[in-house]
Amino acid sequence: MKSTNWWKYLLAVLVVGASGVIFMGFSTYKDAPPKPDYISPSGVEIVQRAAVERGQLVFQKYALMEYGSMFGDGAARGPDFTAEALHRIAVEMNDYYGRQVTNNNLDELSQIEKDGISIRVKRELKANRYDGERNIVVLTEGQAYAAERLVEYYSSKFKGDH
């Protein structure tokens, strides 16, 4: 079993492997999710794309991808910021719509009204409001309110006021 052409097979494997890596690298950037601006229904900018990109740099700098849950095992490695943010958004949206119904007295809400508000919040959170042509997401009034409260919450939390 004397083979003098082993290098041809090695070269073929290296070319195929390198081609795969190059293809995956290209696909990663080509198929990356959009980074839109987030605006209120009245057109006020809530979150700009540049702010999302700055946040992404902080996320990477402090390796925050190492925190939170993975495979449903809970927040064993640290706080799950995504779950916390989503929960706070839902709570703030419920609060916003509840105050609209009762003129700021949430104790007046009946269970049926609370259930209706909860359904509305779930529907709004699941709706895709992305406009690909303008690269924007138009938030609902409740989402815009919750986004502002979320910024206040995390600003306070990370500055030590919370």
Question: Where do the language-model regions lie?
Answer:
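Soluble extramembrane regions of membrane proteins in the secretory/endomembrane system
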Residues: 31-162
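Post-cleavage N-terminal segment of exported redox proteins
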Residues: 1-48
